[in-house]
Amino acid sequence: MLTVKFTTAYKKSYKLMKKRGKNLSLLEEVIDTLRQGKALEERFRDHELKGNFKGFRECHIQPDWRLIYLIENDILTLTLVDTGSHSDLLNL
């Protein structure tokens, strides 16, 4: 089982998603699955990121709600980097 680390950006974005009325139980389901070291269901469209985010992964909680995360197996840590819409995450 992985230890979960929350970045400051993630904590701030989590509050924003709560304020926007997002179904946070969907996010908790994804986090719990990742924490257990299991693969996400195909509906979450989990994929590796490129460019500046190389090494990080992203999944789609809902069509315009994403989670960026990093799994560090050497220290068994799941780092939740950020969550939000595509525009939120890319600062568009």
Ranges and model annotations:
Residues 1, 14-17, 34-37:
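Short, functional N-terminal and low-complexity linear motifs
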Residues 3, 9, 15, 19-24, ...:
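Enriched for short, Lys/Arg-rich terminal
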Residues 3-4, 42:
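Residues that recognize and position ribonucleotide moieties
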Residues 33-60:
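A short, surface-exposed loop/turn module that caps and links secondary-structure elements
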